């Protein structure tokens, strides 16, 4: 789905009183607590916060990798559980740090995803090039790739998707700084070209400064602060955000 006359003024992503908990060893752990916020169409939002703050869980709800216990997650104004799953995942594509690879070659992985998405936007060669995968890797077993190469493959698969929302979960965590910058530039170029909405979970504060126009700060399962990037880094409002910035909390 893309913006049209009916949807162009609707947030691309909205969360309304979202809660999620898990039970383990007889204990209940609140992962998300009453999260409410909107991401407008065309925005790049970086989601920051300490480990265990619920960032990845929140992101994964946008394409039904997980579901909330209560509350709503809406994509273009439609609750995610009302979507056809395949259509939803063609609209909101997820790339994450530990994405599994499929049996077969890198080319096979890319071609299969293209068939699933009914998309031939790019050839496997073009997708590999966009994601910074050397062409000689296309016919290598995907299971032989390094951690960083697997992250690039995950990104290439996401780029094959005719989506308008890009959900990124620590996609440069296994890359060296130069490679991470290359991926950032790729995302920014594609964002400008395709007018994507991007929700990017990262621990890297410098990366967030470079890529995002808006920061969402989370801690202990709560969305504590939403601010323009410059404002967040120069004048955070919440005490937990101040401590995070001061100590580089992870």
From Swiss-Prot:
GO BP: phosphate ion transmembrane transport
A Pfam family annotated for this UniProt entry: ABC_tran
Residues annotated for ATP binding in this entry: 49-56
Gene Ontology cellular-component terms listed: membrane
Similarity annotation: Belongs to the ABC transporter superfamily.
Alphabetized PANTHER family for the sequence: ABC TRANSPORTER I FAMILY MEMBER 17
Name by which UniProt lists this protein: Putative ABC transporter ATP-binding protein YjkB
Lineage: Bacteria, Bacillati, Bacillota, Bacilli, Bacillales
Gene: yjkB
């Amino acid at each position: 789905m893309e913006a049209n006359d009916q949807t162009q003024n609707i947030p691309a992503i909205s969360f309304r009183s979202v809660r999620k908990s898990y039970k383990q060893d007889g204990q209940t752990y609140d992962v998300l607590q009453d999260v409410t916020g909107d991401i407008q169409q065309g925005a790049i939002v970086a989601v920051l916060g300490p480990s265990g703050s619920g960032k990845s869980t929140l992101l994964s709800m946008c394409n039904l990798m997980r579901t909330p216990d209560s509350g709503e997650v809406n994509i273009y104004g439609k609750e995610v559980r009302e979507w056809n799953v395949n259509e939803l995942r063609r609209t909101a594509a997820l790339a994450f740090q530990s994405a599994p690879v499929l049996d077969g070659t890198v080319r096979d992985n890319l071609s299969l995803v293209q068939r699933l998405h009914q998309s031939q936007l790019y050839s496997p060669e073009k997708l590999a090039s966009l994601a910074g995968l050397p062409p000689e890797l296309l016919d290598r077993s995907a299971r032989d790739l390094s951690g960083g190469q697997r992250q690039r493959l995950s990104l290439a698969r996401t780029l094959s998707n005719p989506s308008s929302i890009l959900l990124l979960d620590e996609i440069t965590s296994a890359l060296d700084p130069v490679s991470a910058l290359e991926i950032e530039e790729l995302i920014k170029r594609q964002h400008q070209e395709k007018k994507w909405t991007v929700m990017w979970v990262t621990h890297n504060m410098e990366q967030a400064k470079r890529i995002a126009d808006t920061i969402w700060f989370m801690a202990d399962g709560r969305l504590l602060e939403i601010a323009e990037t410059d404002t967040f880094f120069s004048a955070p409002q919440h005490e937990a955000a101040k401590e995070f910035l001061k100590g580089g909390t992870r």
